[in-house]
Structures are given as structure tokens and as C-alpha cells.
Amino acid sequence: MSIAVIGAGKWGSALFYAFSENNECVISSRTPREMSNFVSLEEALECEYLVCTIPTQATNLWLKQNYKNKGQKILVASKGIDTANLKFLNEIYEDFVDSENLAFLSGPTFAKEIMQKLPCALVANSKNQNLALKFASFFPSYMKAYTSDDVIGAEVCGAYKNVIAIAGGICDGLGLGNNARASLISRGLVEMARFGKFFGAKDETFMGLSGAGDLFLTASSILSRNYRVGLGIARHERLEKILNELGEVAEGVDTARAISKIAKEKGIYVPIASEVENMLNGKDVFESVKSLLGRR
């Protein structure tokens, strides 16, 4: 048995570090890295289990160009919605891979703390519960892995929480206080659940690790890339400058736009996601947040 992590950014490297503790594991990325067990993409794709951390907006093209269906089992560790076709990641992967061979990782985790071996809990989500259990067994003891079959619920939570995290960063950047941020995050959870239930997600997913757990973490910590985007927006910095200085992908930016488009098409009420998109497009941040906090 062998595992290959695809993508050697901070998140991919952290997962490689964790999986390597008890398993034979290699890592690969588009750009060669000076790290142990780094292999070419061709070698990585020969492994039995793949862990994909490819940015959401690049996933469809990457699969078209690189993936040869050899029956591998895949754990998708990215989060977001493709803005080109408004598809969730599970829908994109299912165009190329049998759903029985797919699992999706969710839950409140930061790469930095995984590298420090600090305890955490996460969820392996799959329509194939035997596969979910298999991937859960790969994690070291300080990473408690649960399983779920609510793939769409996990996908909605993983994407949506990044949008609320931008709003949380804006709220803190404006100095509105802990009360305001807590109100915004709580209402964000309700909005996220409303959006997810439209697509058939289970209620309990939003109250667990994939939903409330990941949302509360991501929307209130400086370790969150999307939260830091919000801080920059509150300081009236240009979005391009914020993203360049970040040096990593902040999926919430594209996800806010995708959610707004989907919500308009489906008639779903998503005031926070809509206002985040407006602020990303240049609307005055103080007026936007004031409007959100004043809604009934």
C-alpha cells in the first residue's frame, strides 16, 4: 500500500507529514521541491491512494491533463466551488472518478498546527463508508478522524466557511469587537445551512466538525488565509495586493462569487455571501457590515 499527496503547499506538506508517520507516503507537485520522498507526478499517480490538495479553480483542468483512471482511491483535501461551471468539488471529481473511489476531507484544521503535532479532529466523507474508514485509519493518533456519508454537506461547509471567514476578518479589521464577530459567524452558520439544505445536505453536518467547527476556527483566526483577506479589505487594500502578499490561494474570494451566482439562479437567501462579494468588488466595507448586522 502506498499514498501519494498531490500538491506541496503548506496544506499538502502538512498532510504528507502526518500520513508519513505510519504509512509509506510520497509527495509531488507541479514545481520540484527539496524535500524527502518527493517524486515526479508520473510516479505519484502510480500509487494506490491519492490525496489531492489541488486548488479548486485548477482542479478540472488538472484532472483532464493528468488523471488516468487506474482505480486509485482518492481523498480530496481541497475546498471550494469552481467559478467556471459552478460545480462543487465532488461534482468535478465525479466526472472523472467513480464516486465509490472518492472521499472528501473536512473539519477544523490548520496546517501549521498539524506540523506541530497538536491534537485535532476531522472527517473523512464518502458515499463508500469502507473507503472513508480506510482513509481515517491513515491519520496519526493526534489527528482523530471520524467518518460521514454526507459528501455534499461537507463540500458546502468547506466552501462556505471561507466566505464567512472573509467577513469575520473584515469585522475584526474594522474593530467592531467580539460581540459583532460572534453575531456575524452565528448568522453565517444559519446561512450556510440554508444553502446546503437546498442541495440535500444533512442538518447534523452543519452542527459538527465540518460545519460549526471549521467555521468558528476559520472565521476568527489570523492563521486563516481568508480571514487575513478580510483584514486587508477592512484596511482598504486592493484585493490584488492582498492576494499577492498572501502568497497562497484564498478560496473564499472565488467561492463568494460562485455562491452569489448560484443563489441568484436558485433563489436562495445568502445576505452575507452577497455582501462579501460586494466588498470584494469595492463596496464600502463599513456600510456593508453595518447593513449585515442591522438585518432582521
What are these regions (language model features)?
Residues M1-Y49:
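NAD(P)+-binding Rossmann beta1-loop-alpha1 motif at the extreme N-terminus of oxidoreductases
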Residues V5, I27, I74-V76, F104, ...:
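Structural beta-sheet core signal
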Residues A8, T53-P55, S220:
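Glycine-rich, N-terminal phosphate-binding loop of Rossmann-like dinucleotide-binding domains
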Residues G12-F16, L41-K117, A132-A136:
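Rossmann-like NAD(P)(H) cofactor-binding subdomain of soluble oxidoreductases
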Residues C47, Q65, I92-N101, P119-T205:
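Internal alpha-helical scaffold of NAD(P)-dependent oxidoreductase catalytic cores
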Residues T59, L86-N90, A132, V163, ...:
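A general structural signal for well-ordered alpha-helical segments in protein cores
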Residues V76, N101-S106, A145-D149, M207-G208, ...:
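General beta-strand structural signal in soluble alpha/beta enzymes
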Residues G168, K197-A201, T205-M207, G211, ...:
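NAD(P)-dependent Rossmann-like dehydrogenase/reductase catalytic/cofactor-binding core
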